[in-house]
Amino acid sequence: MSVPKAKALLTVCAALLLCGCGQALSEREIVRAVFFARQQGAYSACLLLADQNTESDGVQYKTASARGDTAAQALHLAEDALPGRLYYGLLDLAALPPGCDWADAQTLGTLLYDKAQPAPELSVFVLDTADHSWAADAASLYEDMKAVEREYDLHCGLQQLFTQTDGCAVPAYRADSGYDFALLAADGASVYVSGLQAQLAAALCGQTDRFFTAFAGGQAVCDTRVNVTAEDTTVQLHLRDTDFQPLGAYNEDWQALLCTELQQAFSALTADDAADFFHLQFWHVNLWGPGSALPVPRLEILFE
């Protein structure tokens, strides 16, 4: 086969793949987000879809939702409620149910992966505990979560649910500002943290490179770029272009106060060894071999 013909064939194959073997995207149900919740012992699943039949300007959405004994059943029933064939290729957000644990994350992550693999742009959050109406709230939840990602340079991909066998870490949505962070251990209790501690956990997990949070009891806001390196169990936190914004007539050593809070947050995050969320045990074993005693993790803060 000649090179031009081979290129033409590849182009046709790619077009058929994107269009669903000849069916145009305009004729399909395009899924943008999937939300899960648990209600009275059952699962609820909501599909947020692009509404291609509206004549309004801008992006418009519609929803399909259902309840089931399992998450898979609820999702399948929501899919069956739609007249067209579903297209998951543009799915870029999934929300796990509030209060979920590691087993839930694995089950739902596998279900989503089967639908949307490899889904490189798919982001994962844990939903908040508010009582949401899917029809009324799904679109705003989607827009809010994507806005949090942009503002805080935050991203937890679907694949991050499966990178460790002892736990996973996922940002948790909150309606007011910022985000919480869920540490879901396979053999321990799930831990949810907020504020500076949540953003430090996200940085240690490689899910953000920015701190933008209040500290010192709400007296100031810190905005800084973050990079994390490690030498054995010593974690080096590199802070660049750091800006402190006092929220009142305060005259404090903001750098010292931030360092104190970061050290306290780090100690709290690393006190529970139910799972190696920050890969400290992994790197120590790689350096010193299995069975070597793990030193107490230490945080070194470097302003650059």
Can you say where each PLM-predicted feature lies in the sequence?
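Membrane-proximal alpha-helical signals and transmembrane carboxylates
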Residues: 2, 8-9, 18-304
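Residue-level signal for mature regions of secreted extracellular proteins and peptides
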Residues: 14-15
